[in-house]
Amino acid sequence: MREGKKRPFAINVWRWGLLILLLVLWEIGARLKWIDPFFFSSPLEIARTAVIKWQGGTLWRDIAYTGASTLLGFVLGTVIGSVVGLLFWFSRPVAQVAEPWMIVLNALPKLALAPVLVIWFGIGFLSKVILAFLMTVVVAAMSAYSGVRTADPALETLMVSLGARRMQIFTRLIVPSAMPSIITGLRVNIALAMAGSIVGEFIASDRGLGRMIVYAGTTFDLKLVWVGVTVLSILSVLMYASVVLLEKVLMRHWHGAVTE
């Protein structure tokens, strides 16, 4: 037991240790001119620039804008896609017709639609949410439908023989069977939603971390570019960690409901 508890702690120490070592080497390399400080800047200069932008009020507004569009697109895409995937159980012929189209839609380069969406819906918040939604909705539907197909046919037959209605079978067998697939798909979807939101900001936007990176690049402000990349990386890690935590809570609740 002690070895099992020490192992995650040791792994975390190594992770943070390697990150700190990388930052120290980066700072030393920039100061000693081993690397060009104009192109690569340095951790301390990036931190100073970030503080200035935060105090000016622009950085936190860009973080809030990108975070909100990502989360809204993620939630809408996951919920609507999961509901669609679950409802396919009520009509197998419809599901069989829709499945190849879902595969085709999932394979389409949806990020290529970003310029079209910006033209249709403008450079504001809505186009970013829609792009994040499109990135996630098909994946969520396919995850839910694959979970539906894992339901035990013998249990379904038994419930029918005992007089269970279709809605009872759906809520007590189909939905619980699909939940693990739906929950597992959350990790993939949060990354896709973030990618959709950022690409939308790259194309055209009045706010957001993506817009900040593009603006900094066009003005050759590479310190600000690194600020945007760093903050975006931190935001991505925080969102992913939150989804992993949510996944654990939902799985624990689901297992508890099944055992009851």
Q: Model regions: which residues?
A:
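Transmembrane-helix boundary motif in ABC transporter permease subunits
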Residues: 72-102
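C-terminal transmembrane helix and the adjacent membrane-cytosol boundary/short C-terminal tail
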Residues: 92, 149, 180, 226-260
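Glycine-rich helix-loop "coupling/hinge" segments at transmembrane-helix boundaries
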Residues: 118-120, 195-232, 251-260
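Generic hydrophobic transmembrane alpha-helix motif, especially the helices
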Residues: 102-139, 146-147
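N-terminal signal-anchor/first transmembrane alpha helix
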Residues: 1-30
